[in-house]
Amino acid sequence: MSLNRVRAEQPAFEVAASAVLIGQAHLGAGALLAQGVVLRSRGGSAALGNHSAVLENGVLVGWPDRPVEIGQRTVFGHRATIVGARVGDLCEIGNGAILMPGSRLGDGCILGEGTLVPPGAIIPDDTVLVGRPPHVLRSATEADRARLAALRGGQVDLTRHPGTTVVAPPVAGAHMGRLYAYRDKSPRIAASAVLFDSAEVTGDVVIGEGSIIGAGVKIIGDSHGPVRIGARVQILENTVLHLLPDNELVVEDDVVIGPGAMIHGCHLGAGTVVEPAAIVCDSSRVGAGSVIRAGACVKQRARFDDRAVLDGFPAVQVGSLDAAPGRPAWAFDPEDLPTPLPLAP
């Protein structure tokens, strides 16, 4: 049985075969979840407006305190990450943009590729925003509006279609995730770990007890070396783990890696939180109980002590924590998950 089945009475929307919907969400008429998109909604906390689209490999995550609410005829580019954010009508969100919890974009906003909107930021209508950290480039012009209208085939009217509520609860199956051997190495997955259907794990990979490997995650442990993932780790939607030759990738217990991240052959200390769309490069080491901020890039061979707060591109230490960061609100609650059946041999 699959984790991405959709039950709906009137399919006035399009969900690609490789897209994954988890939980309850409201999809407007003509809404699109393209290939590889993951939408995770706890408690019915996600809504995509009429004729809005999330393009390939995007991720949306909403929960009751921070719902995802998208207006009409808004388009998100490839690999956009939207976590607990609200976006108005007729917005254009560039490829790789990151919207963090509590942020809010007005109508007609334009975000450049890779723009990061930080937690709680309020962006007025018709703002053109770029960068990490973001800055206002200008207000949208009539030329901008004409271009956006052309991209939408001239259709910029807002409609009254009620849309459809769809429900796709996690369903445990005997073949959760896709496991691939590489030469004489095969993944070893603890019996209590949960792999969502579209996750793929290859080669010399060990995943510990109680860990969660989210939809669309790719973990590659082929000829380049071992991948060791501890207990109670969460690796969330559309994240990629891989490494260079003669290296290893170690994720210690209780680490949480947010959606859309890229983790190379590094060492992440126990209890560390990697926020959405961050990058951690080969041969770097991050101490226990640290936080890597959204969109940050930990460069090759960087070293950071325990409980460091890292941000920037490249990342530098911008603070220290007095205590371990704990599980972020955008992570999975264990009670949200199905009881997994044993993995097939």
Predicted region positions:
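Active-site beta-loop-alpha junctions enriched in small/polar residues
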Residues: V240
